[in-house]
């Protein structure tokens, strides 16, 4: 009999809109390859841009927040594993799953550490340097509590794994490193890449709904591009991204060679035509899908330490990492103009992509899941903090949810 996996999503997967959507599709494909029976449930409205998961044999299920109908649904389904897409979903539905399906393995996929991203954002807003103490926020208390309550939490960044272990004192036994999974390019795909001479202009891409992306576009427009366009009078800046608001479209300026292109049907295609991917991210967390895509098509990247964080560890970066405005401008100019440097960055990208090869991670991850399923009782007994937080969550969250439910009737 097939094992059942229930995924509770924040939104419907949109791999062409965000890296989070691509990540979710990777997880679905991973479990589908094991012939699991998968149900994807979310409380958000259907989207015309969502991936047709039904074509993969995945059941799509609409659910409601703060409603007993979910309890009935999950009790009837009786999944062996429930995967929560970000900590907010675990907060909303974790206690209901624990009550209706106490033997189900509960896995949290963080995507990125929200508390880290928000703390860095606050430091940028306040025009100061980020400090580790900034992490002691209400968001961190919620997110770390969610990690403790879950049987296993998936992390995509080595930096964030280290932060959880060393700063938040999260036991190694309840967190697991599973980054973006990359399939190697074929010789045919590699041979089709445009050469240095065949490429032109700078490009960046990312959902405008993701605050670090929107901030980096404004930063490009106001601080980086005015200097860079003076250095490279023929180069253009092409900005792609899903859900561009009107205020983003207003940044479009042909005279300044700054083009807001909006939605890209194929991220890799637009990145492949550019000579350099330029994304000066001032805050953020997790891994950046734009750089994986850029590396895959051989487009070197200029970014900040935050942009490259967790992506290359001890390997040389696939381009140049710079922090200050003038350094970023110089880096972009050098990489755009120097063919030898550009070719070297391409070679570095190949090594980085190899470190994300799916064959390095999938089998070990599935082995870990099976071991946890077989030893779930012992695993939970060793995580007293998690069981204590779940106990209090089931009380406080449940009563709040019941109150909202009663109020809505």
PLM region spans:
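Acidic donor-binding loop of glycosyltransferase active sites
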Residues: 79-80, 272-286, 299
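Short hydrophobic beta-strand element within catalytic cores of glycosyltransferases
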Residues: 290-293, 300-304
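C-terminal amphipathic helix plus adjacent low-complexity
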Residues: 343, 348-409
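A short, active-site helix/loop in glycosyltransferases that binds the activated sugar's phosphate group
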Residues: 92-93, 140-172, 248
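Acceptor-binding helix/loop patch of EC 2.4 sugar-transfer enzymes
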Residues: 14, 103-137, 197, 207
């Amino acid at each position: 009999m097939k094992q059942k996996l229930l995924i509770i999503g924040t939104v419907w997967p949109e791999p062409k809109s965000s890296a989070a959507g691509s990540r979710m599709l990777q997880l679905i494909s991973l479990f589908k390859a094991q012939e699991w029976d998968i149900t994807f449930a979310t409380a958000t409205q259907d989207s015309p841009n969502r991936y047709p998961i039904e074509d993969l044999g995945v059941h799509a299920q609409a659910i409601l927040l703060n409603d007993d109908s979910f309890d009935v649904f999950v009790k009837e389904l009786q999944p062996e594993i429930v995967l929560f897409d970000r900590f907010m979903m675990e907060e909303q539905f974790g206690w209901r799953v624990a009550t209706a399906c106490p033997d189900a393995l509960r896995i949290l996929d963080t995507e990125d550490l929200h508390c880290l991203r928000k703390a860095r954002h606050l430091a940028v807003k306040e025009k100061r340097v980020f400090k580790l103490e900034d992490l002691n926020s209400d968001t961190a208390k919620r997110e770390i509590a969610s990690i403790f309550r879950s049987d296993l939490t998936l992390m995509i960044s080595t930096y964030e794994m280290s932060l959880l272990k060393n700063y938040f004192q999260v036991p190694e036994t309840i967190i697991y490193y599973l980054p973006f999974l990359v399939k190697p390019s074929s010789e045919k795909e590699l041979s089709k890449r445009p050469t240095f001479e065949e490429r032109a202009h700078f490009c960046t891409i990312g959902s405008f709904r993701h605050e670090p992306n929107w901030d980096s576009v404004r930063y490009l427009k106001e601080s980086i591009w005015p200097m860079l366009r003076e250095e490279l009078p023929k180069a253009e800046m092409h900005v792609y991204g899903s859900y561009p608001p009107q205020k983003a479209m207003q940044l479009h300026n042909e005279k300044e060679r700054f083009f807001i292109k909006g939605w890209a049907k194929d991220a890799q295609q637009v990145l492949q035509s550019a000579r350099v991917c330029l994304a000066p991210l001032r805050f953020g967390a997790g891994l950046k899908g734009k750089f994986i895509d850029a590396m895959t098509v051989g487009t070197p990247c200029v970014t900040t330490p935050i942009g490259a964080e967790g992506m290359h560890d001890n390997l040389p970066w696939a381009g140049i990492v710079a922090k200050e405005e003038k350094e970023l401008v110089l880096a972009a100019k050098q990489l755009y103009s120097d063919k030898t440097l550009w070719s070297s960055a391409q070679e570095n990208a190949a090594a980085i992509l190899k470190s994300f090869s799916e064959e390095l991670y999938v089998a070990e991850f599935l082995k870990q899941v099976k071991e946890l399923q077989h030893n779930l009782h012992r695993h939970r007994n060793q995580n007293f903090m998690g069981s204590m937080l779940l106990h209090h969550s089931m009380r406080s969250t449940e009563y709040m949810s019941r109150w909202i439910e009663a109020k809505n009737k």
